[in-house]
C-alpha cells in the first residue's frame, strides 16, 4: 500500500482525491498526534494557502479538523510555503499547514505539514498521522474546542524577515518578476521594491483559476521576452507556492538552480559563510556544477532527488547551502525550507555587490549538455538491476571519462527508468542516452 504522504505532503485532484473530508481527517489526526506527545498545554497551528480556487474549501476543512481536536488556529491567508514555515517558528506555533500543490496545475491541491520550528515532519510522524485518520475518539467540548483567528500582518512579518536576511540594498537594479499568479504575488513585488529594486511584476493578479497557467518557473518564455522588452538587468520566476526561483539574464538566457547555487556558493565562501566549504545538491545537478565547484575549492555532498533529502543532509551535516536544479534553494541560516524569495534577494544582492551582470556571474559554471530519456518498462527494479544494463553503463562511463556522466534511476511513481547522460557535446549525450534507453527498454 502506498503512503498517503508523498515526498511533498498529500497531493491530488482537489475535491476528488483530496476531499474536504480527507483534509479534515488529516488535520484532526495531526493535532491529536501532537497532543499525545505533550498534553500539558493548548496547541496552536498556523494555516496558509496559495490562491488556487480549492484552497478556500480546504482551508475551512483543515481549520475545522484542527479546532475540533482542540487546537487553536492562526490563519495567515495566501502566502508562500516558506512564509508559513518561517511564521511557524517566529510565532511559536506547534504545527504548520500549507495548502498548495506548488507548480502543479490549478485543479490539483495539497497539504504540507511543518513541525514546531518550521521543519518538515519526519516520515514516522506522517505515517502515524495517516494510520490514525479513521480512529474514533472523544472530541473536546465547550471551552476546550479550538478557536481560529486571522493574522492580518503575516505577510509584512515575512517580508521583514526577508529584508533582515538580505542586507544588501538593491538600488539601481531593474528586475522583472513572474509571480505565476500564485502566492508570490502577495509579497514578492513589494519585498523587492522595499529592498530598493525597480520591479516590473508579471502574472501577479491571481484569480484562483490562473495559477501556473502557462506562467511561472516552468514556463519562462514570457519572462524572457519581458526582460528584453523592459531592458531589465534580470528576471525572476517563481512557482505557485514560491518555494522555487529560476532566473533570466539581460539577454533572456535562463539561469537555472545549479547556476544560482554556484553563484551563491562562491559568494558565501568568499564571505566565510559557507559551512565547511560545502554545497549540498542532488544527483540530477549538472556535472558542470561539480567541475566549477572543484575549481573554487567547494566540496559537494550529493543526495537523492527531492528537497526533503537535501534538507536532511543540510541538517545532519550543519551545512549552509543546498538545493536542486529546479530552483529549490535552501539557506538554513535563514530558512527551514526552500525559499524562492530569499534566493532571489540573495542573487540580486550578489549582482549589485559585485557590479557584474547576471550573465557574467552565471559563467561561474558551464552547463554540460544534459539528455534525459524516460523509458517505460515492465518492471523498473528488474530493468535497473539487469547485468547487461550495468555493463553498458560502465562502458558508457569509460567512454565519457571525466567529461561526462551517466545516471539511471527508477521513477518514484511510475514503471519508468530515467536515463540521464551528460557530455561535452549534445550529439554525444544524445547518442549515449539513446543507446542505453534502447537497451533498458528491451529488458523483460
Curated annotation (Swiss-Prot):
Active site: 102
Keywords: Isomerase, Magnesium, Metal-binding, Phosphoprotein
One GO cellular component, as annotated: cytosol
Record SUPFAM superfamilies: Phosphoglucomutase, C-terminal domain (SSF55957), Phosphoglucomutase, first 3 domains (SSF53738)
Enzyme Commission code: 5.4.2.10
A Pfam family the protein falls into: PGM_PMM_I
PTM statement from Swiss-Prot or TrEMBL: Activated by phosphorylation.
GO molecular function per UniProt: magnesium ion binding; phosphoglucosamine mutase activity; phosphomannomutase activity
Cofactor dependency: Mg(2+)
Cofactor: how bound: Binds 1 Mg(2+) ion per subunit.
Reactions mediated catalytically: alpha-D-glucosamine 1-phosphate = D-glucosamine 6-phosphate
Superkingdom field: Bacteria
Residue numbers bearing the Phosphoserine modification: 102
UniProt GO BP: carbohydrate metabolic process; peptidoglycan biosynthetic process; UDP-N-acetylglucosamine biosynthetic process
InterPro entries cross-referenced by the UniProt entry: A-D-PHexomutase_a/b/a-I, A-D-PHexomutase_a/b/a-I/II/III, A-D-PHexomutase_a/b/a-II, A-D-PHexomutase_a/b/a-III, A-D-PHexomutase_C, A-D-PHexomutase_C_sf, A-D-PHexomutase_CS, Alpha-D-phosphohexomutase_SF
EC class name: isomerase
Job description of the protein: Catalyzes the conversion of glucosamine-6-phosphate to glucosamine-1-phosphate.
PANTHER family named in the record: PHOSPHOGLUCOMUTASE (ALPHA-D-GLUCOSE-1,6-BISPHOSPHATE-DEPENDENT) (PTHR42946:SF1), PHOSPHOHEXOSE MUTASE (PTHR42946)
Database matches in HAMAP family: GlmM_B (MF_01554_B)
Protein name in the entry: Phosphoglucosamine mutase
Species per Swiss-Prot/TrEMBL record: Saccharopolyspora erythraea (strain ATCC 11635 / DSM 40517 / JCM 4748 / NBRC 13426 / NCIMB 8594 / NRRL 2338)
Gene designation per UniProt: glmM
Amino acid at each position: 500500500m502506498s503512503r498517503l504522504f508523498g515526498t511533498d505532503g498529500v497531493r491530488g485532484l482537489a475535491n476528488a482525491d483530496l476531499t474536504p473530508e480527507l483534509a479534515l481527517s488529516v488535520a484532526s489526526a495531526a493535532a491529536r498526534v501532537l497532543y499525545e506527545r505533550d498534553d500539558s498545554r493548548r496547541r496552536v497551528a498556523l494555516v496558509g494557502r496559495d490562491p488556487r480556487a480549492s484552497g478556500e474549501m480546504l482551508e475551512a476543512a483543515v481549520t475545522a479538523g484542527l479546532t475540533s481536536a482542540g487546537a487553536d488556529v492562526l490563519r495567515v491567508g495566501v502566502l508562500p510555503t516558506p512564509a508559513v514555515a518561517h511564521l511557524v517558528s517566529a510565532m511559536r506555533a506547534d504545527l504548520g499547514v500549507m495548502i498548495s500543490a506548488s507548480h502543479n496545475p490549478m485543479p490539483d491541491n495539497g497539504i504540507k505539514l511543518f513541525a514546531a520550528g518550521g521543519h518538515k515532519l519526519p516520515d514516522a510522524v506522517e505515517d502515524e498521522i495517516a494510520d490514525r485518520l479513521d480512529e474514533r475518539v472523544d472530541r473536546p467540548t465547550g471551552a476546550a474546542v479550538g478557536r481560529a483567528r486571522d493574522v492580518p500582518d503575516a505577510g509584512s512579518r515575512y517580508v521583514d524577515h526577508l529584508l533582515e536576511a538580505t542586507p544588501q540594498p538593491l538600488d539601481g537594479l531593474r528586475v522583472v518578476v513572474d509571480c505565476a499568479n500564485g502566492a508570490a504575488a502577495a509579497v514578492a513585488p513589494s519585498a523587492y521594491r522595499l529592498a530598493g529594486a525597480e520591479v516590473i511584476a508579471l502574472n501577479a493578479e491571481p484569480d484562483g483559476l490562473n495559477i501556473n497557467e502557462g506562467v511561472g518557473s516552468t514556463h519562462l518564455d514570457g519572462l524572457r521576452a519581458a526582460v528584453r522588452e523592459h531592458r531589465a538587468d534580470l528576471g525572476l520566476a517563481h512557482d505557485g507556492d514560491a518555494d522555487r526561483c529560476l532566473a533570466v539574464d539581460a539577454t533572456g538566457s535562463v539561469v537555472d538552480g545549479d547556476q544560482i547555487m554556484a553563484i551563491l556558493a562562491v559568494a558565501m565562501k568568499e564571505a566565510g559563510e559557507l559551512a565547511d566549504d560545502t554545497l549540498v545538491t542532488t544527483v540530477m545537478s549538472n556535472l558542470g556544477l561539480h567541475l566549477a565547484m572543484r575549481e573554487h575549492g567547494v566540496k559537494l555532498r550529493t543526495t537523492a532527488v527531492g528537497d526533503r533529502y537535501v534538507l536532511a543532509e543540510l541538517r545532519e551535516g550543519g551545512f549552509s547551502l543546498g538545493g536542486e536544479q529546479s530552483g529549490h534553494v535552501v539557506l538554513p541560516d535563514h530558512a527551514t525550507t526552500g525559499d524562492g524569495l530569499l534566493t532571489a534577494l540573495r542573487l540580486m544582492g550578489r549582482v549589485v555587490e559585485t557590479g557584474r551582470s547576471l550573465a557574467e556571474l552565471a559563467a561561474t559554471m558551464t552547463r554540460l549538455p544534459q539528455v534525459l530519456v524516460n523509458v517505460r518498462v515492465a518492471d523498473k527494479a528488474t530493468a535497473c538491476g539487469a547485468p547487461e544494463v550495468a555493463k553498458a553503463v560502465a562502458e558508457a562511463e569509460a567512454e565519457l571519462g571525466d567529461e561526462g556522466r551517466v545516471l539511471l534511476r527508477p521513477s518514484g511513481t511510475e514503471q519508468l527508468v530515467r536515463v540521464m547522460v551528460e557530455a561535452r557535446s549534445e550529439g554525444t549525450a544524445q547518442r549515449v542516452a539513446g543507446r542505453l534507453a534502447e537497451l533498458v527498454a528491451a529488458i523483460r
